[in-house]
């Protein structure tokens, strides 16, 4: 399922954010590529639930909430988010890329993934996907994108 999310983000969501997608043909295309139908349906369901933030079905996120708090993770969350992942989330909060609200959306979306433990690289993708899809997080998305993809350009030799 996670591979499908990344594939969709790279090939459809990020590049064609304003284009309507036919889910039946998308499902067939993904199946033809080799993804399992169950994983396809799970990934599309995960994205549909995330899109609730975009359609304002769920109360909108306040992008200005900038209070830093310490998040106590549940046992299930700690199993899925290892120490590196939890540290990265805190790091993004300290950089003011994540707010309290977006942090909670990200954790909630991670808990919906059908994986046992998330690694740091996968977490970065999830954070990008969530910030891209939550209204009012455009600036945070661009900050994270620059941090992740332009980091090497900023190193002084």
Swiss-Prot record:
Q: What is this protein called?
A: Protein Smg
Question: Entry's Pfam families?
Answer: DUF494 (PF04361)
Note the InterPro entries from the entry.
Smg (IPR007456)
The domain of life is Bacteria
Please tell me the species this chain comes from: Buchnera aphidicola subsp. Acyrthosiphon pisum (strain APS) (Acyrthosiphon pisum symbiotic bacterium)
Family that this chain belongs to? Belongs to the Smg family.
């Amino acid at each position: 399922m996670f591979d499908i999310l990344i594939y969709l983000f790279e090939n459809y969501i990020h590049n064609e954010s304003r284009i309507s997608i036919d889910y039946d043909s998308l499902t067939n295309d993904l199946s033809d590529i080799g993804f399992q139908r169950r994983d396809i349906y799970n990934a599309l369901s995960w994205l549909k639930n995330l899109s609730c933030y975009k359609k304002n079905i769920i109360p909108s996120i306040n992008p200005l909430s900038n209070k830093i708090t310490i998040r106590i993770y549940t046992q299930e969350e700690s199993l899925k988010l290892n120490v590196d992942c939890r540290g990265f989330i805190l790091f993004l909060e300290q950089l003011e890329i994540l707010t309290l609200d977006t942090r909670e959306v990200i954790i909630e979306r991670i808990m919906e993934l059908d994986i046992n433990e998330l690694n740091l690289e996968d977490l970065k993708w999830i954070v990008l996907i969530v910030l891209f899809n939550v209204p009012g997080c455009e600036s945070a998305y661009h900050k994270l994108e620059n941090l992740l993809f332009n980091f090497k350009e900023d190193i002084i030799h």
